[in-house]
Amino acid sequence: MAQPGSGCKATTRCLEGTAPPAMAQSDAEALAGALDKDEGRASPCTPSTPSVCSPPSAASSVPSAGKNICSSCGLEILDRYLLKVNNLIWHVRCLECSVCRTSLRQQNSCYIKNKEIYCKMDYFSRFGTKCARCGRQIYASDWVRRARGNAYHLACFACFSCKRQLSTGEEFGLVEEKVLCRIHYDTMIENLKRAAENGNGLTLEGAVPSEQDSQPKPAKRARTSFTAEQLQVMQAQFAQDNNPDAQTLQKLADMTGLSRRVIQVWFQNCRARHKKHTPQHPVPPSGAPPTRLPSALSDDIHYSPFSSPERARMVTLHGYIESQVQCGQVHCRLPYTAPPVHLKADLDGPLSSRGEKVILFQY
């Protein structure tokens, strides 16, 4: 994938310094091969071909300018190994990413931009291709769509209004980095024309249909109307049975030509109206025992006098009561007056509603 700017991908290579080689030739070749491995074809620049630079010998007449100077710290490299990237050399410990400061001595590639060293992650996060819709990075393995120099993820190339993903060969409009399908692009043009005719100032961004505008509005439910014959049939049935069963509903549907659901709803509405206009009578709770007294106190109730043939048994008795007492073989008459015993009348008794006080006598 092409990289923006003039950044080039370079390979790092470990080179021998002033000391004689103590490594086996196969090990050196394996290390050089590992360091020269290229990661993908993302760089437009051809990686630099590493070359082995031998340090100047003591008998050589090469000036001191030929010394191996580290590009990072500026000191002479006297170590046994050094790293070389695009004809620039570093100490093994000095080659690191300029952003995250991660050492690149174990990496087989790095990236240079404006004389700055970057690791792969930081280079692509700063200079890599990004999606014009979501702003995230586009990797080399991602499928993309391009429009007017912008790159989009395949899923991000969708209409801004209806969120529908556009397919290959489909017409679309691009308005201020917003992708519109043909339908909503024409809607935007109509909004601009209507605003111009009415003299209203409408910006281009305001003319773009929003996501709420693209959603279809729910249609209003059509009200059901009944003919006089249909109402007559249903009202006659309601007078007989206000809650018909499924079989009766089917018969009414066949007679009126309406659906069972419509007839069922009509009966539900009629029952609700009938219940609303019918006076409600209070019903005593089923768990409470019946009582003969109202909720008011008994002292506040005025009673009517009680007259009954048996009243004589319940009044005070005076005088003598004849009683036979057996005294041996002699029968005699003794005067006897029974002491009164006052008892409270039971509220639930038959006399509680008469207000009489009962006086009983013992014999």
Curated annotation (Swiss-Prot):
Q: Where is the LIM zinc-binding domain?
A: 70-122, 131-184
Q: Give a GO cellular-component term.
A: nucleus
The processes (GO biological process) annotated in the record are: cerebral cortex GABAergic interneuron migration; cerebral cortex neuron differentiation; cerebral cortex radially oriented cell migration; cerebral cortex tangential migration; forebrain neuron development; forebrain neuron fate commitment; neuron maturation; neuron migration
Region feature Disordered, mapped onto this chain: 19-65, 203-224, 274-300
Locations of Low complexity compositional bias? 42-65
Write out the tissue specificity statement of the associated record: Brain specific. Expressed by neurons in the amygdala that are activated by reproductive olfactory stimuli and project in regions of the hypothalamus involved in reproduction (at protein level).
SUPFAM superfamilies named in the record: Glucocorticoid receptor-like (DNA-binding domain), Homeodomain-like
Q: Which SMART domains does the record match to this protein?
A: HOX (SM00389), LIM (SM00132)
Gene3D superfamilies named among the record's database cross-references: Cysteine Rich Protein, Homeodomain-like
User: Which residue ranges does the record annotate as region Required for interaction with LDB1?
Assistant: 55-194
Say yes or no: keyword Transcription present. Answer: yes
Q: Biased composition, Pro residues: where in the chain?
A: 281-292
Primary location class: nucleus
* Signal peptide (UniProt feature, chain positions): none
Keyword Kinase appears in the UniProt entry: no
Against InterPro entries, the record matches this protein to: HD, Homeobox_CS, Homeodomain-like_sf, LIM_Homeobox_TF, Znf_LIM
This molecule's function is given as: Probable transcription factor required for the expression of a subset of genes involved in interneurons migration and development. Functions in the specification of cortical interneuron subtypes and in the migration of GABAergic interneuron precursors from the subpallium to the cerebral cortex.
Per UniProt, subunit arrangement is:
Interacts with LDB1 (via the LIM zinc-binding domains).
Q: What is this protein called?
A: LIM/homeobox protein Lhx6
Q: Which organism is it from?
A: Mus musculus
Q: What gene is this protein translated from?
A: Lhx6
